[in-house]
A protein has these predicted regions:
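TRNA-recognition modules of translation machinery and tRNA-sensing kinases, especially anticodon-binding
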Residues: 1-120
Length: 120
């Protein structure tokens, strides 16, 4: 979420309904970015807690402080789906003249430029 916000992309997290969860998921959140073109949010990533279900299948155990072995709890995350990130970035930073605003977080990597200007 912070990555998207640092790129001046409006973003939100949505807790998924239990009826929408895949087989192993205990809890899941979707990360959604605002699309000015579509005038709605669209999914750009997700974060899911699989409890110990995946670890049971893979026989992944951890030793607890009490010395007993337990099945690990696992997470499944899509931090960034690059094509969706690019779409969200361009849609939220594009100007009417075709130039693209460079967020402050990226300006040091762009030689201090504040905008990308299209070539004629």
């Amino acid at each position: 979420v912070d990555l998207f916000r640092s790129m001046d992309i409006p973003v939100r997290t949505i807790e998924c309904c239990s009826g929408d969860l895949a087989d192993l998921k205990v809890k899941s959140y979707d990360v959604e970015a605002w699309s000015p073109r579509q005038k709605k949010y669209f999914e750009v990533g997700s974060c899911s807690n699989l409890g110990d279900a995946q670890a049971r299948r893979l026989k992944i155990r951890v030793k607890g402080k009490d010395g007993n072995k337990y099945f690990a709890h696992t997470l499944n995350n899509t931090v960034v789906a690059p094509p969706r990130m690019l779409i969200a970035f361009l849609e939220n930073n594009l100007n009417a003249d075709g130039s693209v605003n460079i967020p402050k977080a990226l300006q040091p990597y762009m030689g201090g430029k504040e905008k990308l200007i299209p070539l004629d």
